[in-house]
A protein has these predicted regions:
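Glycine-rich phosphate-binding active-site loops on the catalytic face of alpha/beta enzymes
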Residues: 80-93, 259-261, 377-405
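C-terminal helical cap(s) of enzyme catalytic domains, especially alpha/beta-barrels
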Residues: 94-113, 393-421
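Glycine-rich beta-to-alpha transition loops that act as phosphate-gripper elements at the mouths
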Residues: 63-66, 323, 363-376
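N-terminal capping/small domains of soluble enzymes
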Residues: 2-250
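Catalytic cores of alpha/beta
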Residues: 70-76, 242-245, 357, 370-389
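Conserved, mostly hydrophobic/aromatic
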Residues: 61, 257, 317, 355, ...
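Ferredoxin-type iron-sulfur electron-transfer modules and their immediate structural context
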Residues: 400, 404-405, 410-522
Length: 522
C-alpha cells in the first residue's frame, strides 16, 4: 500500500520561527536539523555581484521545494546559499497538486509548477525569511554589514495573469515592502525580540549583541530588485518578450528570463540523452516544435538586451528550465513530467555555449541544470553566476551538499572577479559534460535503497540497510554511537541482535552495502 505524500504545509509564525531557530541552536547546536559543523562561513575576500547586488556566495536554491517555506530558505542560507530564487508564483494560487509530485531517484522528475501557497501566504513566507536572514547574518558575524544575500522573485506564467490585482499586489510588495502591513509588523516584532536581550544567551554567539542593535531599521523595504520570468512550455515568443518588457519598463526590475532545453531541437537533445545513457527518457518531437525556436529566441534576446540598456537595468537568461518528457506513470501522476538534475548538465551547458558565443560572453547567465559537486567549479570558472540547484539537495546529505560546493569554490576557484563569460570555456565544459563519468547514467546505476515492504502509518522510518540485512542488524544505532565515540554502547547494540557476531561476519554477503542510503553521496 502506498501512503500519500504529506500535502499540508503549515506556516510557522514569525516570533515562533525565531524562537525555534535560536532555541534549537542553543540546546543542540543545530538549526532545522543542520549541525553547526555543516554551517558555511563566508570568506570576506570573496563575493560576486548580480545586477549590482552583492552576493557573498554564488550559490543558492533554485525556485522549487527549497524556497517555498521560510525554514527552507533559512536552511539554505546556513549551508552557503546566498542567491535565493524564490518559488514561482502565479495568478492561479489555489491549485490542487497531485502527490507525489517529485521523483528524484536519480535525475529529477516533477509534475508541480508554482508555489502551493496562495499569493498572500507565499509573500508572508518570503518576508519572514528575509527578516530572519538579516538577523542570522548579524548574530553569526557580529558585524553591522549590508546583506550578503539576494532575494530574486520568480514570476509566471502569462502577462494577463501578472497584471491581475493579486499579482500586482505581490510584485509591488516585493519591490517595496512598505506597501504591506506585515513589513511594519515584523519590524516591530524583531525590535521587541532584540530588546529583550536574551536571544543569544547560552550560545557561542554571546558578545555579538551590538550587531543586533536597531537591526530592524537597517532592513531595506526593497526585497527583490530582480525577477526571473518563468513561462509555460510552448509559450509564444511574443508573450515571453511582452512579459520581460513589462518587467523592465513598468516594474523597473532587473530581469532574467528562463529558457527551455528545447532550444537545442529534438534531434540534439535526443542524441545527448542517448549518449549519456538516459535513453529511457521519452521525448515528443511536437513538444520541441511548439516551443520557442532558437532563431526566435536570439532575435528576442537581442531586443531585450537593448531595451534593458535604455532602462539602465540588467537583463540575462536563466538556463535552463526543466525538460518535458513522457510520463511512464510508475511514480508520478499525469501524462507528462519535467526532468531536472544531472541529466540536464550537458544539455543546459550546450544552450549556454550557444548563447555565450552569440553574445560574446556579455549576456549574464543564471544557471540551473544539474550542477553537482563535480561540475560546480567548472561552471563558475566559465563566468556563469549565480548557480542554483534543487535536485541535488533532494539526495542524501540534503542541504549540506551545497556547503561542500561552496567550500570548493572558496578554496579552489581563482575566477571570483570574472565579469564576462568565457564562451570557449563554456563550450569546453559542454563537451566534457557529455563524456564525463559523472554525467553518465551508469555513474549512479540502478541500485535502489527504497524499502519494498509496507510501512506503518507511524514510526514509518526504517533504514534500507537494516531491512536488507538477513538478521536485521541495527546498523544506524551502531554507526551513530561510534560517531559519538560511545564504543562500548555500540558493541552492545551488535550483541543485542547478534549473539554470534564472529560467525555471522564470516558468512555475511554484505547486503547492507547494496541497500545503503549513502549510495547517493559522492
Amino acid at each position: 500500500k502506498e501512503y500519500a505524500m504529506g500535502d499540508r504545509m503549515r506556516p510557522v509564525p514569525f516570533e515562533e520561527l525565531i524562537d525555534r531557530i535560536f532555541s534549537e541552536y542553543r540546546n543542540h547546536g543545530t538549526i532545522f536539523g543542520i549541525h553547526k559543523e555543516d554551517f558555511y562561513k563566508t570568506n570576506p575576500k570573496h563575493s560576486i555581484t548580480v545586477f549590482g547586488q552583492k552576493c557573498a556566495v554564488p550559490l543558492g536554491p533554485a525556485a522549487g521545494p527549497h524556497t517555498q517555506l521560510a525554514q527552507n530558505i533559512v536552511s539554505a542560507y546556513m549551508v552557503g546559499g546566498r542567491f535565493m530564487e524564490l518559488k514561482t508564483v502565479q495568478i492561479m494560487d489555489h491549485l490542487e497538486i497531485a502527490k507525489p509530485c517529485i521523483d528524484a531517484r536519480d535525475e529529477g522528475h516533477n509534475v508541480e509548477w508554482s508555489t502551493e501557497y496562495t499569493l498572500e501566504k507565499a509573500y508572508d513566507e518570503y518576508l519572514k525569511a528575509y527578516f530572519v536572514l538579516h538577523l542570522i547574518q548579524a548574530a553569526f558575524t557580529g558585524k553591522v554589514e549590508e546583506p550578503d544575500f539576494i532575494f530574486n522573485m520568480s514570476v509566471g506564467y502569462n502577462l494577463e495573469g501578472i497584471k491581475q490585482p493579486k499579482m500586482q499586489t505581490y510584485i509591488d510588495s516585493m519591490i517595496d515592502a512598505n506597501k504591506s502591513p506585515l513589513f511594519k509588523q515584523y519590524k516591530t516584532s524583531l525590535k521587541n525580540i532584540i530588546e529583550e536581550g536574551n536571544l543569544l544567551e547560552g550560545t557561542d554567539l554571546e558578545g555579538n549583541e551590538k550587531a543586533l542593535k536597531a537591526l530592524e531599521n537597517r532592513i531595506s523595504a526593497n526585497i527583490c530588485p530582480s525577477v526571473t520570468i518563468s513561462t509555460m512550455h510552448g509559450c509564444p515568443p511574443k508573450e515571453i518578450e511582452a512579459i520581460c518588457s513589462y518587467m523592465l519598463t513598468e516594474k523597473k526590475l532587473n530581469t532574467f528570463v528562463k529558457l527551455n532545453p528545447t532550444l537545442l531541437g529534438y534531434d540534439k537533445v535526443r542524441s545527448i540523452l542517448d549518449e549519456t545513457g538516459f535513453d529511457h527518457v521519452g521525448l515528443k518531437r511536437e513538444s520541441f516544435e511548439h516551443d520557442l525556436q532558437y532563431s526566435d529566441a536570439i532575435a528576442m534576446l537581442h531586443r531585450l538586451v537593448e531595451l534593458a540598456k535604455k532602462q539602465n537595468l540588467g537583463f540575462g537568461v536563466k538556463l535552463t528550465n526543466t525538460l518535458g518528457n513522457i510520463n511512464d506513470g510508475i511514480v508520478l501522476p499525469g501524462e507528462e513530467k519535467y526532468m531536472s538534475g544531472r541529466a540536464l548538465l550537458p544539455i543546459s551547458t550546450t544552450v549556454a555555449s550557444l548563447l555565450s558565443e552569440e553574445f560574446d560572453g556579455k549576456l549574464p547567465v543564471s544557471y540551473s541544470g544539474g550542477c553537482t559537486v563535480f561540475s560546480v567549479k567548472d561552471l563558475f570558472d566559465t563566468g556563469i553566476r549565480p548557480i542554483t540547484m534543487a535536485t541535488d539537495m533532494l539526495k542524501p546529505g540534503g542541504y549540506a551538499r551545497m556547503a561542500q560546493m561552496a567550500q570548493i569554490l572558496d578554496k579552489e576557484s581563482l575566477t571570483w572577479d570574472k565579469k564576462d563569460i568565457d564562451a570557449k570555456a563554456v563550450k569546453a565544459l559542454s563537451e566534457k559534460a557529455k563524456t564525463a563519468e559523472y554525467s553518465q547514467k551508469a555513474f549512479r546505476g540502478d541500485n535502489q535503497a527504497k524499502v519494498d515492504e509496507e510501512l506503518p502509518m507511524f514510526d514509518c522510518y526504517i533504514s534500507p540497510c537494516m531491512q536488507a540485512c538477513p538478521i536485521h542488524q541495527n546498523i544506524p544505532d551502531y554507526v551513530g554511537l561510534v560517531g559519538d565515540g560511545h564504543y562500548a554502547e555500540a558493541l552492545s547494540v551488535i550483541y543485542e541482535g547478534n549473539a554470534l557476531p564472529n560467525i555471522t561476519c564470516n558468512i555475511c554477503d554484505h547486503q547492507c552495502q547494496f541497500h545503503c542510503a549513502r549510495m547517493d553521496y559522492e
